[in-house]
């Protein structure tokens, strides 16, 4: 973009876009990936998979509790892989800041925290990285990655493998859903 090969759709956003890309690609951050349009509110890609949705509904009926569904990626001016924060939080949008309320709920929550979702190489990995930095060790040791309930973006399998190794090193479990004790 700095060389002028690519430009934002709105020329007035050039300086903001360049600053954003520099912050996004700062050491330890991610490189910009231009994704196809996906997970748009109101489309199947944004919805909970039907089988999982039915299982959640049964659990809610059985327990009388409500599953907390968290929206992310609501600001089109920043990437938000993690369920907890945007890659580059915006000062003009609190929804992009670290979701402390969600972290507090998870820290004090159920006996076991199960992690699943798409994609293990990006969104799940970013969410777990945020959990590793924010949740107490006793909570992390009661957290399990459901390895057959997630998959990587093609070409990024190494990031998904790194997620599992990093999680195990921090005391999280990793197993297939059929291996879960009842």
Indicate where each model-derived feature is located:
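Active-site-adjacent betaalpha module
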Residues: 1-182
């Amino acid at each position: 973009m700095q060389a002028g090969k690519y430009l934002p759709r709105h020329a007035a956003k050039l300086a903001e876009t360049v600053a954003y890309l520099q912050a996004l690609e700062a050491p330890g951050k991610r490189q910009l990936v231009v994704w196809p349009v996906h997970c748009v509110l109101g489309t199947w890609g944004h919805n909970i998979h039907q089988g999982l949705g039915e299982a959640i509904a049964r659990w809610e009926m059985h327990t009388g509790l409500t599953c907390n569904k968290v929206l992310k990626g609501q600001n089109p001016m920043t990437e938000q892989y993690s369920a907890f924060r945007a890659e580059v939080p915006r000062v003009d949008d609190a929804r992009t800041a670290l979701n402390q309320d969600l972290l507090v709920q998870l820290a004090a929550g159920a006996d076991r925290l199960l992690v699943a979702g798409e994609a293990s190489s990006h969104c799940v990995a970013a969410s777990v990285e945020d959990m590793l930095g924010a949740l107490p060790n006793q909570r992390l040791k009661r957290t399990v990655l459901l390895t057959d309930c997630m998959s990587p973006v093609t070409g990024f399998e190494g990031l998904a493998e790194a997620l599992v190794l990093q999680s195990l090193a921090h005391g999280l479990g990793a197993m297939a859903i059929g291996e879960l004790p009842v």
